[in-house]
Amino acid sequence: MFVGEYYHSLDEKGRLIIPNDFRQLLGETFYLTRGFERCLNIYTITDWNNFSQIISSFSPTDNLMRKLCRFWFSGSIQVTTDKLGRILIPSFLIEYAELSKEVVIIGAGKHIEIWAKEKWEEFNKEENILENMNEINSKVAELWKK
């Protein structure tokens, strides 16, 4: 599982150091894709393939799933770390996530998220998890029963 919060800098060429703890779990090659909250997500090859199989299995007549497939596949690239543990983030993903020099890399369980520092701080203010704790606890309790 990916856990933790790391503050790093995106260099002028769009390169970002992936924390060593994360690299050990990811391996050298993995997938970088658009996230659902204007962040970027990193998945192991196995998890990316599993999710890709799931969304590809829906009927091609399902308009919503076609939109998800377009979003997912067009916004995904396979990346490999260099000798310094950096990845090169393409400009279209930098623009999507509105990344600037300061970024936050967080562990989110089965994947990693890359956020613009300002957006991460804003998200944490807006999405006060403590205000939703009763609803969250109910969902977790349901999962524990299974």
Swiss-Prot record:
**Span of domain SpoVT-AbrB:** 5-47, 76-119
Q: Which residues cross the membrane?
A: none
Q: Could you name the domain of life of the organism this protein comes from?
A: Bacteria
Q: Which GO terms describe its biological process?
A: negative regulation of DNA-templated transcription initiation
Q: Which cellular component appears as one GO term in the record?
A: nucleoid
Q: Which CDD domains match?
A: MraZ_C (cd16321), MraZ_N (cd16320)
Name the InterPro entries on file.
Answer: MraZ (IPR003444), MraZ_C (IPR035644), MraZ_dom (IPR020603), MraZ_N (IPR035642), MraZ_sf (IPR038619), SpoVT-AbrB_dom (IPR007159), SpoVT-AbrB_sf (IPR037914)
Q: Does the keyword Transmembrane apply?
A: no
Q: Where in the cell is it found?
A: Cytoplasm, Nucleoid
The answer, when asked if Membrane is one of the entry's keywords, is no
Q: A Gene Ontology molecular-function term? A: DNA-binding transcription factor activity
SUPFAM superfamilies linked: AbrB/MazE/MraZ-like
Keyword field: Cytoplasm, DNA-binding, Repeat, Transcription, Transcription regulation
Q: Which NCBIfam families match?
A: division/cell wall cluster transcriptional repressor MraZ
* Family of the protein in this entry: Belongs to the MraZ family.
Subunit comment for this entry? Forms oligomers.
Listed HAMAP family: MraZ
Give the protein name, as stated in the record: Transcriptional regulator MraZ
Q: Which organism is it from?
A: Dictyoglomus thermophilum (strain ATCC 35947 / DSM 3960 / H-6-12)
Species classification? Bacteria, Pseudomonadati, Dictyoglomota, Dictyoglomia, Dictyoglomales
